[in-house]
A protein has these predicted regions:
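Acidic, proline/glycine-rich low-complexity IDRs
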Residues: 1-26, 99-157
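Generic structural motif
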Residues: 72, 93-95, 149, 153
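Ser/Thr-rich, low-complexity intrinsically disordered terminal regions
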Residues: 75-92
C-alpha cells in the first residue's frame, strides 16, 4: 500500500507519480528519408556550407505544411541547411531540413523545439501537442510526395 491509499486511488497516485517524476513520452522530432526528388540547386552551396542543400525540399514542405493548416514564413538558409518558420503563438516553432550525409540521396528534417517543455519567462510551456501536430503534417506531406522512401522517425531525447 502506498501511503495508506487503497484500490484505484493508489493506482492513480502511482500512475501520476511515475509519469510526472519519470520520463515524458518521446515526441517525434527527427525524420530521415531518401529521395531523388530534391536535388541541389545551382549556387545553393554559396548560400549555405559546401556540400549542403535542401532548398527544393524546404519550398515543398512550406507549401505542403501550409496546405495542412500550418502556415509559415519563407524558408531561409542556415549553415546546416534550410529553416522553415511556422506560425505559433506560444513559442518559436520551425522545421529544419537538408541533405543527410549517411546517403547520397538522404535527407533529414527536424522540428524545433525538440524538447517536450520550453521555458518562457517564469512559466513552462508544454510543446508536445503542437510538435506532434507538426510531425503528423510533416509525415503526411512526405508520404504524399511519392518520391520519398525509407522514412524513419526518431527523437533527439
Amino acid at each position: 500500500m502506498v501511503h495508506g491509499l487503497k484500490g484505484r486511488h493508489r493506482d492513480f497516485w502511482v500512475a501520476t507519480k511515475s509519469f510526472t517524476h519519470r520520463q515524458v513520452p518521446p515526441v517525434r522530432t527527427h525524420v530521415e528519408f531518401r529521395s531523388d526528388a530534391f536535388p541541389a540547386q545551382p549556387g545553393e552551396d554559396e548560400q549555405i556550407n559546401p556540400g549542403r542543400w535542401g532548398k527544393v525540399l524546404a519550398e515543398y514542405l512550406r507549401s505542403a505544411l501550409t496546405q495542412r493548416g500550418l502556415p509559415g514564413g519563407e524558408p531561409f538558409a542556415e549553415d546546416w541547411g534550410w529553416c522553415i518558420p511556422l506560425e505559433n503563438e506560444k513559442f518559436p516553432l520551425w522545421v529544419g531540413c537538408g541533405n543527410y550525409e549517411d546517403y547520397p540521396d538522404g535527407f533529414l528534417c527536424f522540428i524545433e523545439p525538440s524538447k517536450p517543455v520550453v521555458r518562457k519567462l517564469f512559466s513552462k510551456i508544454d510543446t508536445t501537442r503542437r510538435v506532434e501536430q507538426v510531425a503528423s503534417a510533416l509525415e503526411s506531406a512526405l508520404l504524399a510526395h511519392g518520391g520519398v522512401r525509407e522514412l524513419r522517425w526518431w527523437s533527439e531525447h
